Every structure is written in C-alpha cells, then in structure tokens.
Regions:
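An N-terminally biased module of ancient metal coordination in phosphate/nucleic-acid-related enzymes
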Residues: 1-78, 261
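Active-site gating/metal-coordination segments in enzymes
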Residues: 3-12, 77-160, 167-169, 208-219, ...
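Hydrophobic faces of well-ordered beta-strands that scaffold small-molecule active sites
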Residues: 24-29, 68-71, 94-98, 120-122, ...
C-alpha cells in the first residue's frame, strides 16, 4: 500500500487506505492537449486547459491503477485525434470511447478499434438535449454502427431520458453504459422518479453504470445520502458497475458560468479520497475487485 504523497496538476491526492486489486481500471478519464496540436471544435461549450498522458500516468501510477479508459471529451467534437493519440501512447494499458457522426466511415471505426476504442459516446447532457424521441433515434443509429464491432454505447444523460429509452434498450444486443450515476440526485434518495427503472435495467443485464463523479450528483459526496444511493446500486447488481475518476474533472464550478473562449479550470478533486470512498461503500474485497478490475476487463476487452 503506497503512503507517499501524490500531487498531479497541482492537486493533492490521498494515499489509498485499502489494497488496490491487480489490473484495476479507471473507466472514465479525459485527455486534453497539447492545445497547440489539437484544435477545439467551434461548437464547444467550454475551453479546457491541458491534461496530458504523462499527467494521467503519474496519477494512476501513484494510485496503483493499471488500466484506463479515455473518454473522448466534447470540446473536440467528433475529431478524435487527441484521444486516439493518447491510446497509442498508452498501448495495451488503455482503451477508448470515441464520438462519431454520420460522416464517420466503417474504415475509420476499424482503425479506431485497432488502437483500443471499444465504444462510442452520446453526450446528451452537456449539450442540454433531453428530448426522448431524439435520444431514441440517436440510440438506434449508434448501436447499429457499433454492433458489428462488438462495442458498447456510452450515454451521458439523466434518469428521465434513461427511463424513456427503456423499451428501446430492451430490444438491443449492444451494451449501454450510463455515466455518472445516470445523474441520479443523491439527496432525492432511492425513491426518486425513475431510479426504479435504473435498477430494473441493471437487473436485466442490458446496461452498465459508472460510479463516477459523485460530486456531480451529491451536495456532499461523503454524506449519508450519497452513501445510501451507492450502496443500493452495489448491492443490486455489482457485476454491472464500473468506477471512473472523471479526471481531470472538467465540468465547471457550481454557480459559475461556462466560457467557450476562456480556459476553464478543472475541479480540484482528490482522486485518492474518491477511491477510498468507493472502498468504504463496498462490503468486501471480492466486490471491490469486481467493480475495479473484473467488470472493466470484460466490457472493454482488456
């Protein structure tokens, strides 16, 4: 167990207070930059600073994380160059989730597969898209594109949109992964609208859920409400859960406007503390190993 202090991008991270399982995977990270090499999309809604592969590796080596999933971030639009180059640097340690559009060819998808991409992302929430019909159309289109490759579809959306997609999801053979607790609000508890649908979809085995970025869904990520919601999910279907840090933690600060043309500071999240919190949510080492290592190995084809 490593007890040395760790600081990455000026953010300190606690030492782990548990034994990290072998082949543990951080299933939700982003890489940004160098900004001179990778132009941002003109349609972005924020401007990130640089967060490079060496920074990510410094974090993961310090926290004993052996594997990583790079999720293509929205400021680059459908230009996956930064994510794909990061995967080339990571080699077998890394997997990726890309963002595509109707112009992406099958040959491009095959090339992405070769460097480690294993899914595509529909980022509805960042774009403020909550239209259920649009979401269903996008879901059907996306799964048709990735099914021949054996990939999954990752969605960033909320509980209401997720619930509206239940019938469509039940017709798919492609796994669907929901980011960030599917934005279930911890303070609303496990009886909040549509939380039962999330549990039902998890029980069906058709969807996966990322226990990632609790600061996005709880006023107090260490509080009783967050703990209750997380433990309910873990007890329900631990073989369909993943953990992700959301490093380097984009997303703006609460109450502050976002700017397209001004570098937005990342949230100073302590990822060592986040991992220790996860370990406290879980009752036993076998379940922790399942969430951190076994499940990612299966979904991301490590």
């Amino acid at each position: 167990m490593n007890t040395s202090p760790l600081t990455v991008l000026s953010v300190p991270h606690d030492a782990l207070n548990f034994a990290m399982p072998a082949e543990a995977c951080d299933c939700h990270t982003h890489v940004f930059g160098p900004s001179a090499n990778y132009p941002l999309s003109s349609e972005r809604n924020y401007m990130p600073g640089d967060a490079l592969v060496p920074d990510l590796l410094a974090l993961h080596d310090g926290l004993q994380i052996a594997r990583v999933v790079i999720v293509h971030p929205s400021p680059y639009g459908t230009d996956n160059a930064c994510t794909l180059d990061a995967l080339r640097l990571l080699g077998p340690r890394g997997r990726g989730v890309a963002v595509i559009d109707a112009h992406t060819t099958d040959a491009e998808l095959q090339a992405m597969h070769k460097v480690g991409v294993r899914g595509i992302r529909l980022n509805l929430e960042t774009s403020g898209i909550h239209n259920s019909d649009y979401a269903a159309t996008q879901l059907r289109w996306a799964t048709a594109r990735v099914a021949p490759l054996g990939w999954h579809l990752q969605m960033f959306t909320n509980l209401s949109v997720m619930a509206s997609l239940r019938e469509v999801i039940n017709t798919l053979d492609t796994p669907v992964v929901f980011d960030h607790f599917c934005l279930a609000r911890a303070e609303l508890g496990t009886s909040q609208p549509h939380f039962d649908t999330l549990l039902a979809l998890l029980a069906s085995g058709r969807v996966w859920l990322k226990l990632s970025a609790p600061h996005r869904v709880a006023q107090d990520p260490d509080g009783a409400a967050m703990t209750e919601m997380a433990r309910t999910l873990i007890a329900h279907r631990p073989d369909r859960l993943l953990w992700g840090s959301d490093w380097p933690h984009p997303g703006g600060r609460p109450g502050q406007p976002r700017h397209r043309d001004q570098v937005e500071a990342f949230n100073p999240i302590n990822d060592g503390h986040a991992l220790n919190r996860l370990a406290a949510w879980v009752d036993d080492a076998a379940t922790l190993r399942q969430i951190l290592a076994t499940n990612p190995a299966r979904l991301y084809d490590f």
